[in-house]
Design a protein with these regions (language model features):
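Catalytic alpha/beta core domains of metabolic enzymes, predominantly
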Residues: 50, 67-157, 163-182
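Active-site beta->alpha loop and helix N-cap motifs at the rims of alpha/beta catalytic domains
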Residues: 1-62, 96-99
Length: 186
C-alpha cells in the first residue's frame, strides 16, 4: 500500500566510501521492497573532515534520493547543491538548533540554501530544520523557509498547544507551581 505523504531517512553506518555506497544502494532498495519513499542519509563529511560530495554526486546520479546531514555552513550547502543531480529529490539537513547553540542565526543559512536552489534550478531539493531545541522552532523553521522540521514528540505536543492558553493563565499556573514546589520541598 502506498504511503504518499510519508518518507523515511535511513543512515549509512560507514566511513569508507565504497562501503557507504554499498550500504546506500541496499537502503535505497528497501523503498521498493517495502513500498516506502526512502531517502538515504549521508553525512556531509567523513570522520577525518573530508567532504562526502564525491559519494553524494555518484549516488544522486544513480537516482538515489539522499538526505545529506550534519550541515552547518554556506560552503557545505554550495558543495552539496553542486553535487546533487537536478532530477533526483534530495534533503539537506541543516542543524539549526546546534547553530543557535553557538550563537549563529540559522535563518541566514536557510536563506542561502533557497538562493542556491534557485540559482541551480534544482527544485527537488528540500531543506530540513534539524536539532530542534524548543517548540517555537516550529515557527522559526517556517519563517526561515525550511521545507521540513524534525521535532521530538514532547516538542510536537507543545506545538499542538500553541494559542490554546492565554499568557496570564500560564503566568498564574507558573506561580502556583512555584508555591507547590516550595511546599513539597518543606
Amino acid at each position: 500500500q502506498a504511503r504518499p505523504e510519508t518518507n523515511i531517512s535511513l543512515e549509512v553506518f560507514a566511513d569508507d566510501p565504497t562501503e557507504m555506497i554499498r550500504q546506500a544502494r541496499l537502503i535505497d532498495s528497501w523503498g521498493d521492497e517495502f513500498n516506502y519513499d526512502v531517502y538515504v542519509k549521508i553525512p556531509v563529511m567523513h570522520y577525518d573532515g573530508t567532504p562526502t560530495t564525491p559519494i553524494i554526486a555518484a549516488l544522486a546520479a544513480e537516482g538515489i534520493k539522499l538526505n545529506v546531514t550534519a550541515v552547518f555552513t554556506f560552503e557545505q550547502i554550495d558543495e552539496i547543491v553542486d553535487a546533487l543531480d537536478e532530477k533526483t529529490p534530495a534533503i539537506i539537513s541543516i542543524f539549526a538548533g546546534r547553530l543557535r547553540d553557538i550563537g549563529i542565526d540559522a535563518h541566514y543559512i536557510f536563506s542561502h540554501g533557497a538562493d542556491e536552489r534557485t540559482r541551480t534550478n534544482k527544485s527537488l531539493i528540500k531543506y530540513l530544520w534539524a536539532s530542534s531545541r524548543e517548540a517555537y522552532n516550529f515557527i522559526d523553521a517556517q519563517s526561515a523557509g525550511a521545507d521540513i522540521i524534525t521535532m521530538t514528540p514532547d516538542l510536537i505536543k507543545k506545538v499542538n498547544g500553541f494559542n490554546k492558553k492565554e499568557p496570564k493563565q500560564f503566568s498564574l499556573e507558573t506561580c502556583q507551581m512555584f508555591i507547590d514546589d516550595a511546599t513539597k520541598a518543606g
